[in-house]
Amino acid sequence: MNQDWLFQTETSICQLRTAGVLVRDGKVLVQRDGVEYALPGGHVKIGETTVEGLVREYKEETGADVKVGRLLWTEECIWTWNGKLAHDLAFYYQIELCHSGDLPDTGEFIPQKDNGRIVLGWLPREQETIPNFV
């Protein structure tokens, strides 16, 4: 289980991603890379399930242990990224922290554990950004 479920050619990229929706006190945890926001998660490795990948990715990125709940939605997205045709499949799960103190809400964005360029922070949950079923 060492290789990411990620396939590339000179002109294309295809990947399987898993991410978690963590809501606490009316806020959702997001990651920010420059001006782009996403839900924390990452590539699934070949031979692991999307749930196993999410638990592993959350630990790598945040240092927190999570319990994975129900699958909220799936996404298939095709677009051009860095001049390549990108085809992503993603699974989004409801999650909760095993230990509530693992990710404090200081009002500041903090660097991710495995990539300091990407920061984590809590944003207010608003009707326009988070579906009702979350």
Give residue ranges: language-model regions.
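Acidic, metal-coordinating catalytic segment for phosphate/diphosphate chemistry
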Residues: 1-19
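Short hydrophobic/aromatic beta-strand or adjacent loop that forms the aromatic wall/cage
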Residues: 15-19, 88-92, 117
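Nudix hydrolase/Nudix homology domain
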Residues: 33-37, 102-104, 108-134
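Short, solvent-exposed loop/turn segments at secondary-structure junctions
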Residues: 38, 75-80
